[in-house]
Design a protein with these regions (language model features):
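Conserved, mostly hydrophobic/aromatic
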Residues: 7, 146, 326, 392
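C-terminal substrate-recognition/cap domain of FAD-linked oxidoreductases
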Residues: 160, 169-171, 179-344, 351, ...
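Glycine-rich N-terminal segment of FAD-binding domains in flavoprotein oxidoreductases
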Residues: 1-41, 56, 76, 318, ...
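Activity-critical C-terminal alpha-helical subdomain
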Residues: 120, 369-406
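Alpha-helix capping/hinge segments and adjacent helical runs
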Residues: 353-365, 378, 393-397
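FAD-binding subdomain of flavoenzyme oxidoreductases
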Residues: 43-196
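Short, ordered loop/turn segments at secondary-structure junctions
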Residues: 18-21, 41, 81, 197-200, ...
Length: 406
């Protein structure tokens, strides 16, 4: 509070920093100023297992929290690929592989403590499942990427650990067959917890990087079912039938906890497996999300356009909620390659907006997607700027992110 008050009076830019796992330059300091590290704000303040909620400081990580919760029979279900800090996940409105069942950070956050640019401290929301008490200030700060204040505490809704968890892998002859199966699974109303897609190229990379065994280099879906043993078996029967109708292979089951963890670790390691393809390289990741009825069309479009430019670009997707990523490993010194990547990205964004989708499902806007936000919400940005100027008139909070104020 004192730091922000001093910075505000002296018009010194401030960038809040947690674990630094964001992908869009969200925590890059692009002006002279200071970075506030929240790494020591890593305490779990309270757990109320009987009410399925907890309160944590901003730099508690998802893994730290779930380790702490294990004996209480509850868990925190939002699981991005990186071991991100909860405050950062709130700031980008993150999600992960289980969003299809448990939602995103917007779903599970019921309250925040935020330090405003002038040093004032506010508490939004509370512990209840619902409230009609005034403006929803909690949701104002979720996804604001540190541009309106510093999130220091987060009130979270938790979920009970399921009685039965079953994971399986299914291979398909084409990517379209895999995506169609995922789309139909959701449209049939199957209560699935995870339905993740890896294309053929990404399976090849993941098998080598994560040492996966007994899986094929083919377009693949990773499934996970949460519920009672009886309900899971009923869901599995329907999904197996849908997969079979789309030329899917026989399900390969990850029977025990160790096998399941290895399978999902390979999915979480996708970004790092692609990064390892280029020495000192980077990974450009798209993050489009479309209505579930348009996911097959959008993935097919991306596949065709990738083949046109002739670059290696593995694909992964949280297909259950219409979100997928095309990953380009590249050398930052190769301007020609980067130009091709951006041209592809521009085409995919245009197609996504044509399909009534969004430019970013979970990574946020940061520095890299500002021009795309102008395409998606040209009418909304003036109001966003009005809100920003009202809360942060000196523009000290993470300036230059999401949009350019001036």
């Amino acid at each position: 509070s004192r730091i922000l008050s001093i910075c505000n009076k002296n018009k010194i830019p401030v960038v809040p920093f947690g674990t630094g796992t964001s992908l869009e330059g969200n925590v890059v300091g692009n002006e002279k100023g200071i970075t506030i590290s929240l790494e020591k704000m890593n305490k779990i303040l309270s757990v109320n297992a009987e009410d399925f909620d907890c309160r944590v400081q901003a730099c508690v990580t998802k893994e730290q929290l779930n380790e702490h919760l294990r004996e209480d029979g509850v868990f925190f279900p939002i699981d991005p690929g990186a071991n991100a800090a909860i405050g950062g996940m709130a700031s980008t409105s993150a999600s992960g592989t289980m969003a299809v069942k448990y939602g995103t950070m917007k779903t599970v956050i019921t309250g925040l403590t935020v330090v405003l640019p002038n040093g004032d401290i506010i508490n939004t929301g509370g512990r209840t499942k619902k409230t009609s008490a005034g403006y929803n200030l909690t949701n104002l700060f979720i996804g604001s990427e540190g541009t309106l204040g510093v999130i220091t505490e987060v009130q979270l809704r938790l979920s009970p650990i399921p009685e039965s968890i079953m994971s399986a892998v299914c291979h398909f002859p084409t990517l379209e067959d895999a995506v169609k199966t995922a789309q139909e699974t959701i449209q049939y109303g199957i209560p699935i917890a995870r339905i993740e897609m890896l294309n053929k190229d990404q399976m090849d990379i993941s098998i080598n990087y994560s040492k996966l065994k007994d899986v094929n280099v083919e377009p693949t879906l990773f499934f996970e079912f949460h519920g009672s043993e009886i309900s899971n078996k009923e869901s599995i029967k329907v999904v197996e039938e849908l997969s079979n109708n789309n030329k899917g292979s026989k399900f390969k089951w990850a029977a025990d906890l160790e096998e399941r963890n290895k399978l999902w670790q390979a999915r979480w390691d996708v970004y790092y497996s692609v990064k390892a393809l280029v020495n000192n390289g980077r990974v450009y990741s798209t993050d489009v999300c479309v209505p579930i009825s348009r996911i097959t069309e959008c993935v097919k479009f991306a596949e065709v356009e990738v083949n046109k430019i002739g670059l290696r670009a593995p694909m992964v997707g949280h297909l259950g909620d219409g979100n997928f990523h095309v990953l380009f490993p590249y050398d930052p010194n190769d301007k020609e390659i980067y130009k091709k990547i951006r041209e592809f990205s521009n085409k995919l964004i245009d197609k996504t907006l044509e399909l009534k989708g969004t430019i970013t499902g979970e990574h946020g806007v940061g520095l890299h997607k500002k021009s795309y936000l102008l395409k998606e919400h040209p009418d909304n940005i003036p109001l966003m700027k009005t809100i920003k100027r009202s809360i942060d008139p000196n523009n000290i909070m993470n300036p230059g992110k999401i949009f350019d104020l001036n």
